[in-house]
Amino acid sequence: MLSADKQGLAAFLDGHAPYFEEIADRIWEHAELSLKEYASAALYLGKLRELGFTVTEKLCGIDTAFCGSYGSGRPVIGILGEFDALSGLSQKAGETAHNPLVPGGSGHGCGHNLLGAGSLAAAAAVKAYLEQSGRPGTVIFYGCPGEEGGAGKAFMAREGLWKQLDAALCWHPGDANQVSTGTNNSCIQVLYKFSGVPAHAAGDPFNGRSALDAVELMNVGVQFLREHMTPDCRIHYAITDTGGISPNVVQAKASVLYMVRANKVADSVKLQARVDDIAKGAALMTGTSFERVFIDGTAELLPNFSIENALYANMEAIGVPSFDEDELALAAALKATYPGSGIEGIKGARENPEIRKQVLALSGNGAKPLNDFLAPRYSSTSISPGRTDVGDVS
């Protein structure tokens, strides 16, 4: 049963739901890419002021990073909001077939329109509680840009922004009501920009120094490195600039972007150093030079089982959302467009046979269009292969 304080929080959220739903819809329409979320940031800044938060813009020198705070004293609780979109995923809301708002435009494939709005709702509810109770404590909503690319939270960590917090909370839209657990890979991205000497490939090749050759030799070197990595490591690359489209020219410029992953950030740093050495070797072999441009890096997430337990207890007490017939019909239509039972994303359903048994029973063997139940409690240190800059807050 919910305490009187928690009943007040629930009533606040229910009463203000349309306000925050409208924010989510507007962010869906803005759909701005990482570190370019200018309209989205402006919308949130306006709403924070409207809600009575003290606002700080351009946190850590990042144009679209900001925060809104309320209260005084401890504990200091940070609630993280994200709002960046992904390229090429523009989509009209409520439709189950591809139908972009802007052909070729960006869209919210990861639901960050909901993530930011939901986090703001949580911060506003805590503010209302502090106002009504008169108790000490500070709540801070952080507008965190560049989660999809740019690792905004990592640069905010570099400036020591998270040190003032006693706890930080975040959430992510998904197809299950659950407490997230486990960790993820750390990651580093570096761009290598090679420079050589142009020449005619037929008439004067001996005076040319090919930057494109350097990129290709670097890629070959990394391929041979793969055998000597530990199994948890990954290396990915994309040639971002071939120098030109004329094969009869020795290309003087070429670039390649590398991403390395490992379970621990210290191991990513070691692996990245080996990739750096391969770039040096490629330049030496081709008589070229290169510029190393650090793009971003993220640490692994450190799970906090105490907070996980508190979250789960409150989710049990408050219950899961209910859905009307129209929402269930839309969910069923969406589910029909992709394979799987819809339970694959539930924590523990793959790793733990007992959890899987419970989930199958609750989901009707995966037949339900929506997972309208609270997933069983599950804590783990298992590793997700992807990355998130939330790790740099943990």
Where are these regions (language model features)?
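Acidic/His- and Gly-rich active-site-bordering loop/insert found
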Residues: 2-108, 113, 117-121, 125-138
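A non-catalytic, amphipathic alpha-helix used as a structural packing/dimerization or gating element
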Residues: 8, 12-22, 39, 43, ...
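Divalent metal-coordination and catalytic microenvironments
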Residues: 27, 68, 79, 112, ...
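Conserved short loop/turn motifs at secondary-structure junctions
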Residues: 32-33, 142-146, 295-300
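Generic structural signal for residues in well-ordered beta-strands
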Residues: 55-56, 139-141, 237, 290-292
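Histidine/acidic-residue-rich, glycine-tolerant segments that coordinate divalent metal ions
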Residues: 64, 86-88, 95-107, 113-114, ...
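Short amphipathic alpha-helical face segments that pack within enzyme cores
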Residues: 117-125, 213-217, 392
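Metal-dependent amide/peptide-bond hydrolase catalytic core
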Residues: 216-394
